Amino acid sequence: MKRGKKNSDAGDRLTNSDTRTGSSELNAMMKPSLSSMKTMGLLLAVLMVASVMFSLSVVLRDPPSDDVIETEAASRVLQSRLHQDGGLSEKKAQLGNINLVPSFDKESCLSRYEASLYRKESPFKQSSYLDYRLQRYEDLHRRCGPFTRSYNLTLDKLKSGDRSDGEVSGCRYVIWLNSNGDLGNRMLSLASAFLYALLTNRFLLVELGVDMADLFCEPFPNTTWFLPPEFPLNSHFNEQSLLRNSGNPMVAYRHVVRDSSDQQKLFFCEDSQVLLEETPWLILKADSFFLPSLFSVSSFKQELQMLFPEKDTAFHFLSQYLFHPTNVVWGLITRYYNAYLAKADQRIGIYIGVSESGNEQFQHLIDQILACGTRHKLLPEVDKQRNLPSSQVLNRKSKAVFISSSSPGYFKSIRDVYWENPTVMGEIISVHKPSYKDYQKTPRNMESKRAWAEIYLLSCSDALVVTGLWSSLVEVAHGLGGLKPWVLNKAENGTAHEPYCVKARSIEPCSQATLFHGCKD
């Protein structure tokens, strides 16, 4: 028992000794560990403080300037709108197995990509079939354009006058010749010619003229629509009798003008179109809006119904597809718009196609314009009994009135009405007119560019008021913008009566009636 106790005591002593020794060793080992933990804790505390300071700096830092916000917002709007349905070649859509992919250089024609920023979205929907047919036409343009192999083959046949001579290209052409220097009529006529080319699967070639390339961007990717200057018949375009009686089966000449003879009007008859099917080159001289007459050709009717389920949208969609202002003209448009029209809540266009003739008639027309505008809530009423609007009815809504007229007097009178008198509800009204010149009389160089800019600005209006005497310029404007204008009624005995104006039934150009053709069918 004593041995056992002794052993036990020894063991206890050993254990105690070991414990003390282990404790010492453990303490020795723990010292550096505690030091490391303190260091890590300090680092963690520093990181936490740094994190808090960074968060505070993010919260309390100065907000970005308004300019940055506006720039970023404008960029987002632009990117968003560029993907909207603003025209066939700007968007990327898929129709069946057909991809419509942009293939233009943006910088060469900014208006093609920026138009939706200045004009409100069209209330009309373009048919998917029109998208499809335009894409097919662009394919035709790439295959049959000037100086392509197909073009050269067809040109060789024209020179030889032999239909059976050499390889067949499969390309047919319609050459549009302008017979009217007026810009508006040129655009109406050219849109009509393009629809004819679309319906007959012909390549449209456009006579260059003195200013066409200065006014309009190329509408089709990769290939020009302008007739090459070296085209062999260029020198004979004014010799109509020579073209009619050339005896060359490869070319036909047709003259479509408002004063066409009965024989020339037969162009819109089915039999005439059948005869032209085998003719590779058709020279078409036109001076007016003949698009409505194409709806009378029986073989075109079904195709037109598919292209334009709403018949009166034809010019609207075709003009937006074809007519893109060049960068020079686009600069005129955007600078004016941004300076005078952009900040307004509403933009009202007024086209006055009547020259100033006598004080009494002049004042009657001013009164009628104002009466029309106020009756239909386009223009605000003025309070001639007060110097300032009542603070009880203060309305800060702004309206910009854009006046297009060759006579400065109308602009000055309407401007003075809103300058000299407060509006009843306190609206802010600004009245603008870009120029006093008559563009119609000098359709070239800068005057044509300004005329095109003015047409475009009118098309950007939210509402449009026009005099009863129509102009091709305003017809293009409301057709391009998809607007049904308010048309002033003709005054009786120089005095206007109710109704002062009526809203047009269509957005299409309508002052030029469909050509009566007298076809047997």
Curated annotation (Swiss-Prot):
Membrane topology note: Single-pass type II membrane protein
Tissue-level expression: Expressed in roots, stems, leaves, flowers, siliques and seedlings.
UniProt xrefs under InterPro entries: XG_FTase
Keyword Aminoacyl-tRNA synthetase: no
Lumenal side: 61-521
Membership in a protein family: Belongs to the glycosyltransferase 37 family.
The protein's name in its UniProt record: Fucosyltransferase 3
Organism: Arabidopsis thaliana (Mouse-ear cress)
